[in-house]
């Protein structure tokens, strides 16, 4: 067993145009002051990272990581959640997702997809330059508008969607393998990879690619009533990344899983700051330790109620309190009689 690293913080919800969130130097200092030891970097945030430079220049990456270390944090992983989303977009979502892309490819789905693929590949190369072994992203979605089986889905519709999704991602996964980096898909509603079954459907089509892995986030499982602890045991060999995020699901006689088109504040299922939701993180961290997860515990702060800076501060302490420093010996070693093969055979009557 290995002790999980952390706490880390995903900067996606914090990067902005106001200090200290508007530069790499200042945001890493801020994260360290909040108690974090690592940061996960949203590569679409140009005020923090020049992704192309990071992919093309080892010197740039050395300086980038050096600034973080000098300020007290490590770079845990890079993220292309927004770009990965654009690898596969159903036409119904074209306009909604267009803002994720560079201005020059908006309104052109084919060019936008090509741009997205290039972005993910740049991030994979940048990860290699930074010495990082795992990368966070979304799968995108072609079948999501048909998630509920009404009207009746035509035979082969979902299979065709997943065949195409695998076709788009396989060259990226091959490139990831060349860079020595795992692609960790955040299993998330709105993506075709939104639970274990859909991950397996994808995995089958990419021929169990060794670089196709999972970003585990229990909050997304709480909101769809999935057993988030059993999930860790089932996919322990594929879980290469961990978002620590809380959630609560409080159905009423008026709404349930679908949320009734309500705001996040008024939904039956909603994300919460760590400790304010229903996730049993004691059990989650125990499972992670028992299953030998050796990555980072990265706080992803999302809450419709609490101020983000309060959530960040509390999140660091929460993770510190839950990380299990794994034991190096059995608790009952004091009662050991030693190892003696002859004695073992006598005890067995052999």
Language model regions located:
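Acidic/histidine-rich catalytic cores of soluble enzymes
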Residues: 4-7, 22, 38, 78, ...
């Amino acid at each position: 067993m290995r002790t999980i690293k952390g706490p880390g913080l995903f900067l996606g919800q914090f990067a902005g145009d106001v200090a200290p969130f508007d530069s790499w130097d200042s945001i890493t200092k801020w994260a360290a002051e909040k108690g974090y030891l690592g940061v996960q970097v949203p590569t679409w945030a140009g005020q923090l990272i020049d992704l192309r430079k990071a992919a093309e220049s080892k010197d740039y990456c050395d300086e980038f990581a050096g600034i973080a270390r000098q300020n007290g944090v490590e770079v845990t992983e890079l993220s292309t959640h927004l770009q990965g989303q654009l690898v596969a977009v159903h036409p119904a979502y074209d306009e909604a997702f267009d803002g994720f892309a560079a201005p020059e490819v908006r309104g052109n789905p084919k060019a936008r997809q090509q741009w997205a693929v290039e972005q993910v590949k740049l991030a994979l190369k940048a990860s290699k330059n930074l010495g990082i072994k795992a990368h966070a992203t979304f799968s995108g979605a072609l079948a999501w508008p048909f998630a509920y089986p009404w009207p009746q889905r035509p035979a082969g519709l979902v299979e065709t969607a997943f065949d195409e999704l695998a076709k788009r991602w396989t060259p990226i996964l091959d490139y990831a393998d060349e860079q020595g980096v795992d692609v960790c898909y955040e299993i998330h509603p709105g993506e075709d990879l939104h639970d274990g079954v859909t991950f397996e459907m994808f995995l089958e089509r990419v021929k169990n690619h060794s670089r196709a892995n999972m970003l585990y986030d229990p909050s997304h499982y709480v909101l769809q009533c999935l057993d988030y602890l059993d999930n860790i045991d089932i996919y322990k060999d594929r879980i290469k990344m961990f978002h620590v995020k809380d959630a609560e699901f409080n159905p009423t006689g008026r709404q349930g899983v679908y949320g009734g088109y309500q705001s996040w504040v008024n939904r039956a299922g909603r994300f919460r700051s760590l400790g304010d939701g229903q996730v049993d993180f004691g059990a989650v961290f125990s499972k992670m330790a028992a299953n030998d997860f050796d990555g980072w515990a990265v706080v992803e702060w999302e809450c419709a109620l609490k101020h983000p800076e309060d959530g960040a501060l509390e999140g660091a302490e929460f993770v510190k309190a839950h990380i299990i420093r794994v034991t190096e010996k059995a608790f009952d070693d004091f009662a050991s009689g030693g190892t003696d093969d002859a004695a073992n055979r006598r005890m067995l009557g052999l």
